[in-house]
From Swiss-Prot:
Residues 7-287 form the tr-type G domain. Residues 291-312 are annotated as: Disordered. This is Elongation factor G. Pfam families: EFG_C, EFG_III, EFG_IV, GTP_EFTU, GTP_EFTU_D2. Keywords: Cytoplasm, Elongation factor, GTP-binding, Nucleotide-binding, Protein biosynthesis. HAMAP family: EF_G_EF_2_B (MF_00054_B). GO terms for cellular component: cytoplasm. GTP binds at residues 16-23, 84-88, 138-141. One of its GO terms (biological process) is ribosome disassembly. PANTHER family: RIBOSOME-RELEASING FACTOR 2, MITOCHONDRIAL, TRANSLATION ELONGATION FACTOR G-RELATED.
């Protein structure tokens, strides 16, 4: 690929709720761009993008496969790197990870379901990473499909600025095609060629007025972002050319000022080519993005890199996958410079140079070998020994650390053991590999019981992990019952003097600190340790202060009630003293750990549990039962709405501890007619009676409360 083709590159992802038809849409894109010969249907478990066996069985997408494809638009051939992201709440890490490296996204919605809870979560994640997007309303052929209602919801629920650039011709089973408001033509797809052919005709007479009205709204919206267009819009809108509209829409989209909206039915092969055209027309290329900013690991200074192959190399590893044929594949996005097969590249986290033996561009899980991956492109490499998700790969002579991604902490854990003791090594090897791939999945050994506990974002997440252990690593596991990841907090401030002295012949140990330990300030929102140093006059030498801080940070991993980590803590180091010979960094660290244990026991320790934001869609007649059941589960109903299809939407906050097996219970209450989705919201204090029960179970005693 020539260097100047970067403006024809699009790194995009499709983000959506579970059933918005995201994988089907990706499949159609691959079909029309000529990469797949037979369309893979999710219904029959043959979709090319869903390449792990469990995905094909469950019909949901778990790992974002990165696929490179090409599309001709307006006389140019565009290169599209397509990242398929999962929509299930348990897989937020995958979504965060892919959004970090995209330039633009297609937000897919179901024309019947509209903006669903997960769509909201993903939308906010895309805002966080400043990803411009266009929206695609899928499933226009389904009964209850309503494009304009989804436009309204995008405004109301997401606070977006939607701008329809097409309107549907018909809906539900009469959905025939689209009116393109930019070209002012009607597009009809041919069923006999699976939608590969379509005809462009005049707009049907009964839609002319509606099309003119929506075109006018579109022009008014984009004219705000283009002065020349604004003048024409007020003088004589009929003189506005197609090129001017496309240019203004592109600028407004790249600035994230508007979200162009399209619609179609991927399953019925209608609307996908228009979507591809407008991906090329409106979404940014790597050149539209600002220079990537990172920090120099040696000096801590901020540096930026241009999206050009001539600049020094910088790339971000965004996914690690184990492939049965080539071993460990590392997916990365190159921001500047280039990575060549057979060359050495520096990892700024590990401080080591690694040889990239081979490079691939992926088509789903088939690899096409390439020699070089340049700035603005996405690819995968083999040969890395020590690499984690979020690592920066760069030039050893010009090291840089790009902003990594932050992932939510796991909320649910289960103890696992292999069915046969001889599989113990296989299990620990498998778990270590899976934890490398997925930052929201953690493995630890419970100190009291010696059991291996795996933690993740939900029951489905852990089911899939156990399933993968069986398939990929051939280890069958016994599982304990799910455990909630509680946290602890303290409610009072305690002033304490702690002295640590040890004489054991020769040089001793000595540290003396006076601290105030209590809850964090209200404006300290990031959690963790808030450390304030108020020591005057060198009573504790400067070099020992970080050791005190480190001691508290280490100690916070184990609370005094039941060993759960402390959510947040404020420590003010007021004063202290030291011994010129016996004091060292370790003495002050141990002193801080002792101070923590003694102070927290007196500081009103409480237990905190994860609270989930739950949304249940249920038929009207089951409403009472659903709410009654939520009350039994200590749920707080926060609101009820009616959906267009006549169902009721119940929104509630419910403790995770009460939600195990909820999907099955809900099915029973509503005879399988209700659906639910839940996402972690926050940790909240547990009432003392429940805290006592939890402590009895975990510690066998509850006398600390």
């Amino acid at each position: 690929m020539a260097k100047n083709d970067l403006h024809l590159t699009r790194n995009i992802g499709i983000m959506a709720h579970i059933d918005a038809g995201k994988t089907t849409t990706s499949e159609r894109i691959l079909f029309y761009t000529g990469l797949t010969h037979k369309i893979g249907e999710v219904h029959d478990g043959a979709a090319t993008m869903d390449w792990m066996e469990q995905e094909q069985e469950r019909g949901i997408t778990i790992t974002s496969a990165a696929t490179t494809t090409r599309w001709k638009y307006a006389g140019d051939t565009y290169k599209i790197n397509l990242i398929d992201t999962p929509g299930h709440v348990d897989f937020t890490a995958e979504v965060e990870r892919s959004l970090r490296i995209l330039d633009g996204a297609v937000a897919a919605y179901c024309a019947v379901g509209g903006v669903e809870p997960q769509s909201e979560t993903v939308w906010r994640q895309a805002d966080k990473y400043n990803v411009p997007r266009i929206a695609y309303v899928n499933k226009m052929d389904r009964s209850g499909a309503d494009f304009f209602e989804v436009v309204r919801q995008m405004k109301a629920v997401l606070g977006a600025n939607p701008c329809p650039v097409v309107i549907p011709i018909g809906a539900e089973e009469n959905f025939k095609g689209l009116v393109d408001l930019i070209k002012m033509k009607a597009i009809y797809w041919h069923d006999e060629t699976m939608g590969a052919d379509y005809t462009i005709e005049e707009i049907p007479a009964n839609l002319v007025d509606e099309a003119n009205e929506w075109r006018d709204k579109m022009l008014e919206k984009v004219a705000e972002f283009d002065d020349a267009l604004m003048e024409k819009y007020f003088d004589d809108p009929s003189t506005i050319t197609e090129e001017e509209v496309l240019r203004a829409l592109r600028n407004a989209t790249v600035q994230m000022a508007v979200v162009p909206m399209l619609c179609g039915s991927s399953f019925k092969n209608k609307g996908v080519q228009t979507l591809l055209d407008y991906v090329c027309a409106f979404l940014p290329s790597p050149l539209d993005a600002e220079n990537v900013v990172g920090t120099n690991p040696d000096t801590g200074a901020e540096e930026d890199r241009k999206p050009s192959e001539d600049d020094k190399t910088s790339a971000l590893a965004f996914k690690i996958a184990t492939d049965p044929y080539v071993g460990r594949l590392t997916f990365f996005r190159v921001y500047s410079g280039k990575i060549e097969a057979g060359s050495y590249i520096y990892n700024s986290r590990s401080g080591k140079k690694e040889r990239v033996s081979r490079l691939f561009q992926m088509h789903s899980n088939k690899q096409n070998p390439v020699e070089v991956i340049g700035a603005g492109d996405i690819g995968a490499g083999v040969g890395f020994k020590d690499i984690h998700t979020g690592d920066t790969l760069c030039d050893e002579t010009a090291p840089i650390v790009l902003e990594s991604m932050d992932f939510p902490e796991p909320v649910i854990g289960i103890a696992v053991e292999p069915k046969t003791q001889k599989d113990m090594d296989k299990l620990s090897n498998g778990l270590a590999k899976l934890a490398e791939e997925d930052p929201t999945f953690t493995v630890k050994t419970d100190e009291q019981t010696g059991q291996t506990v795996i933690s993740g974002m939900g029951e489905l997440h852990l089911d899939i992990i156990i399933d993968r252990l069986k398939r990929e690593f051939k280890v069958e596991c016994n599982q304990g019952k799910p455990q909630v990841n509680y946290k602890e907090a303290i409610t009072k401030t305690v002033n304490l003097r702690e002295v640590y002295k040890k004489q054991s012949g020769g040089r001793g140990k000595f540290a003396d600190i006076i601290v105030n330990i209590g809850p964090v300030d209200e404006d300290f929102t990031q959690g963790g340790l808030q450390f304030v140093d108020e020591v005057k006059g060198g009573n504790i030498p400067k070099e020992f202060i970080p050791s005190v801080q480190k001691g508290f940070q280490t100690a916070m991993k184990n609370g005094v009630l039941a060993g759960y980590p402390l959510d947040s803590l404020k420590v003010t180091l007021v004063d202290g003293s030291f011994h010129p010979v016996d004091s060292d960094q370790l003495s002050f660290e141990i002193c801080a750990i002792q101070a923590y244990k003694n102070a927290c026991a007196k500081a009103g320790p409480v237990l905190m549990e994860p609270i989930m934001k739950l949304e249940v869609v249920t038929p009207e007649e089951n409403m009472g039962d659903v709410i009654g059941d939520l009350n039994k589960r200590r749920g707080q109903v926060e609101g009820m709405e009616s959906s267009r299809s006549g169902a009721r939407i119940v929104k509630a906050m419910v403790p995770l501890a009460e939600m195990f097996g909820y999907v099955t219970a809900l099915r029973t209450i509503t005879s399988g007619r209700a659906t639910s989705s839940m996402v972690y919201s926050h940790h909240a204090q547990v009432s003392s009676s429940i805290a006592k029960a939890v402590l009895e179970e975990v510690k066998g005693r509850a006398d600390l409360l």
